[in-house]
């Protein structure tokens, strides 16, 4: 169901950035697939035709874990349900009938979610052989990336259908 209080005026963009409140497959499906389906249904019911739909996804759609680098063109073969659900939701966004862009964010960190900082403070060591990498992005950088993409599209710039949001 669509929440009360959603806008009645013209909608120029839809940025779908959800978070599953349950960390098992039905919770992920509810947040990312059913939630997006509901939002797209609302657009159709209201006759809304956004200029673009942005779907905030995850680097979890990639299965690479042997130290290799990935980019937007890397193979997506997720082995876990989280990546599989995100990939399915990405396809829903891409097939929605509007121009769509997937933004695959790495794991968010910020003062509100200090898990990563706590791991470092507690002395967590990362193995060097084979090398292990962690894909992360600060929440402010993630928001700035989305704002940049919106501004670029609004100004008539060309956008790709996929971007990675990862701190350097």
Name these PLM-found stretches:
Residues 1-42:
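NAD(P)H-binding glycine-rich loop region in Rossmannoid oxidoreductase-like domains
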Residues 38-81:
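Conserved Rossmann-fold NAD(P)-dependent oxidoreductase catalytic core, especially the SDR/UDP-sugar
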Residues 80, 94-134:
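NAD(P)-dependent short-chain dehydrogenase/reductase
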Residues 84-87, 96, 109-122, 148-163:
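Glycine/proline-rich active-site loop of Rossmann-fold NAD(P)-dependent oxidoreductases
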Residues 85, 115-117, 128-150:
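Substrate-positioning beta->alpha
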């Amino acid at each position: 169901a669509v929440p009360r209080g959603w806008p009645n005026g013209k909608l120029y963009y839809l940025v779908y950035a959800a978070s599953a409140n349950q960390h098992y497959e039905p919770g992920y499906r509810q947040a990312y697939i059913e939630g997006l389906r509901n939002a797209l249904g609302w657009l159709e019911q209201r006759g809304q035709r956004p200029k673009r739909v942005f779907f905030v996804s995850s680097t979890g759609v990639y299965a690479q874990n042997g130290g290799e680098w990935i980019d937007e063109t890397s193979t997506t073969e997720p082995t876990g349900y989280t990546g599989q659900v995100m990939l399915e939701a990405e396809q829903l966004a891409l097939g929605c009938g509007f121009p769509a862009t997937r933004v695959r964010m790495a794991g968010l960190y910020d003062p509100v979610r200090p898990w990563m900082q706590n791991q470092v403070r507690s002395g967590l060591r990362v193995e060097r052989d084979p090398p292990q990498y962690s894909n992360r992005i600060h929440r402010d950088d993630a928001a700035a990336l989305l704002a940049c993409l919106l501004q670029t599209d609004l100004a008539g710039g060309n956008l790709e259908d996929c971007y990675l949001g990862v701190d350097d």
